Amino acid sequence: MDSNTITSFQVDCYLWHIRKLLSMRDMCDAPFDDRLRRDQKALKGRGSTLGLDLRVATMEGKKIVEDILESETDENLKIAIASSPAPRYIMDMSIEEISREWYMLMPRQKVTGGLMVKMDQAIMGKRIILKANFSVLFDQLETLVSLRAFTEDGAIVAVISPIPSMPGHSTEDVKNAIGILIGGLEWNDNSIRASENIQRFAWGIRDEDGGPPLPPKQKRYMARRIESEV
């Protein structure tokens, strides 16, 4: 096993512990808590894959961080902070919407690029809007927290979410997952539109009528793919 992989995991465990302490002291906001829960699942998955104990890894990570801080100067910290852009958190969904339970009559699912796409293939002839919570860096979607598809009456019919045990995803992974979701739902004559935030930060476009940011050929391709691969 690569030593850098172990070191990275140990440091991630300790930094998660620090963030957890902040949450326990009510010193953080809702997006912070969202990322904390998501990262906890990811660390458990990585720990299982690597065969490492989380408690031991956290203690080793503490030693590594303390060694770095002892040799770090205030000037170096100022330079690092100034040169590193901070991601923004975009929320289409409320806490209630992102945590609401949902059920599928005809479940279909597919894994793509570290993301799980789940949808109810029993949904037909509905108007559906896609909403997502995600972070943005350099004016582009960086990390997806959750994407959900809602009918006009608020029912959830599809979800895209990161797989905790997998090592992350790219903007292209998110776009591909959305394409699969749109293709699968449109197969049953549903009308799909994406939120302005999804269109702007995933595809870099603004569509005033809220239509799905995919050309017809790509949507047909995704529809065929969902039928053949799911």
Curated annotation (Swiss-Prot):
Chain intervals for the UniProt region annotation (RNA-binding and homodimerization): 1-73
Region annotation (CPSF4-binding) ranges: 180-215
InterPro entries documented for this protein: NS1, NS1A, NS1A_effect_dom-like_sf, uS15_NS1_RNA-bd_sf
Single GO MF descriptor: RNA binding
GO biological process terms on file: symbiont-mediated suppression of host cytoplasmic pattern recognition receptor signaling pathway via inhibition of RIG-I activity; symbiont-mediated suppression of host gene expression; symbiont-mediated suppression of host mRNA processing; symbiont-mediated suppression of host PKR/eIFalpha signaling; symbiont-mediated suppression of host type I interferon-mediated signaling pathway
Extent of motif Nuclear localization signal: 34-38
Pfam families from the UniProt entry: Flu_NS1
Localisation per UniProt entry: Host nucleus; Host cytoplasm
Keywords noted in UniProt: Eukaryotic host gene expression shutoff by virus, Host cytoplasm, Host gene expression shutoff by virus, Host mRNA suppression by virus, Host nucleus, Host-virus interaction, Inhibition of host innate immune response by virus, Inhibition of host interferon signaling pathway by virus, Inhibition of host PKR by virus, Inhibition of host pre-mRNA processing by virus, Inhibition of host RIG-I by virus, Inhibition of host RLR pathway by virus, Interferon antiviral system evasion, RNA-binding, Ubl conjugation, Viral immunoevasion
The record's account of how the chain is modified after translation: Upon interferon induction, ISGylated via host HERC5; this results in the impairment of NS1 interaction with RNA targets due to its inability to form homodimers and to interact with host EIF2AK2/PKR.
Chief location bin: host cell
GO terms for cellular component: host cell cytoplasm; host cell nucleus
Cell membrane is among the record's keywords: no
Span(s) of short sequence motif Nuclear export signal: 137-146
Keyword DNA repair on entry: no
Chain intervals for the UniProt region annotation (PABPN1-binding): 223-230
Disulfide cross-links: none
UniProt subunit comment: Homodimer. Interacts with host TRIM25 (via coiled coil); this interaction specifically inhibits TRIM25 multimerization and TRIM25-mediated RIGI CARD ubiquitination. Interacts with human EIF2AK2/PKR, CPSF4, IVNS1ABP and PABPN1.
Primary role: Inhibits post-transcriptional processing of cellular pre-mRNA, by binding and inhibiting two cellular proteins that are required for the 3'-end processing of cellular pre-mRNAs: the 30 kDa cleavage and polyadenylation specificity factor/CPSF4 and the poly(A)-binding protein 2/PABPN1. In turn, unprocessed 3' end pre-mRNAs accumulate in the host nucleus and are no longer exported to the cytoplasm. Cellular protein synthesis is thereby shut off very early after virus infection.
Family: Belongs to the influenza A viruses NS1 family.
This protein's domain notes: The dsRNA-binding region is required for suppression of RNA silencing.
Protein name as it appears in the record: Non-structural protein 1
UniProt source species: Influenza A virus (strain A/Chicken/Germany/n/1949 H10N7)
Organism placement in taxonomy: Viruses, Riboviria, Orthornavirae, Negarnaviricota, Polyploviricotina
